[in-house]
């Protein structure tokens, strides 16, 4: 299914977008990187690529007699549609291994990031961290090393908390386990 995705931003966002790209490659592989493009500081090029992508989507749907207002051909397993409750138990039991199919690893990484956001900014998540300590995120080194690098970069770039105030205290701990 054609679906144009472009990660873009000003020149100042280039290092950030490159870090995301490297993380996707290190954890999900080159095949996952082929599902998006990165365009830096060029709104006209983004518009051009999105217009071309939209043409491809329309052509694809016309050829298959599919609607334009709803993607009837897209099938998403129910397990990927359920909300993730970021409890300490759920965070610790996430499977983060390169041995998983890429779509399952991607879903579990999304859950891990969702938990980190909850622990950083959501009232219930903050209270759970205060009561039980940081979440533990377990996984094999092939996933955990790139995840730890990315999260450390986010901390350095002040992406984990609002500017000002006290220094960021992580609401998580990255724990490497043996590869499955």
Q: Could you tell me what each predicted segment is?
A:
Residues 1-18, 32:
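Short, acidic/small-residue loops that bind anionic groups at enzyme active sites
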Residues 14, 40-44, 141:
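Electropositive phosphate-/nucleotide-binding environments in soluble metabolic enzymes
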Residues 15-18, 30, 34, 47-50, ...:
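Generic marker of "main functional regions" within proteins
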Residues 16, 21-23, 36, 80, ...:
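Sequence-level detector for tyrosine residue identity
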Residues 23, 27-111:
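Charged, amphipathic alpha-helical linkers/stalks
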Residues 112-180:
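C-terminal non-catalytic accessory extensions
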């Amino acid at each position: 299914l054609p679906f144009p995705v472009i990660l873009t931003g000003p020149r100042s966002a280039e290092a950030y977008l490159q870090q995301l790209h490297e993380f996707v490659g290190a954890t999900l592989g080159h095949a996952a990187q082929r599902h998006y493009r990165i365009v830096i500081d060029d709104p006209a090029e983004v518009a051009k690529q999105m217009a071309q992508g939209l043409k491809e989507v329309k052509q694809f749907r016309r050829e298959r007699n599919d609607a334009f207002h709803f993607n009837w051909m897209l099938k998403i397993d129910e397990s990927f549609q359920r909300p993730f409750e970021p409890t300490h138990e759920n965070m610790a039991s996430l499977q983060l291994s390169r041995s998983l199919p890429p779509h399952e690893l991607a879903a579990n990484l999304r859950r891990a990031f969702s938990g980190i956001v909850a622990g950083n900014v959501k009232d219930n998540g903050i209270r759970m961290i205060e009561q039980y300590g940081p979440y533990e995120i377990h996984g094999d080194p092939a996933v955990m090393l790139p995840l730890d690098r990315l999260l450390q970069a986010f901390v350095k770039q002040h992406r984990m908390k609002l500017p000002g105030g006290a220094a960021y205290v992580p609401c998580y701990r990255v724990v490497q386990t043996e590869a499955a």
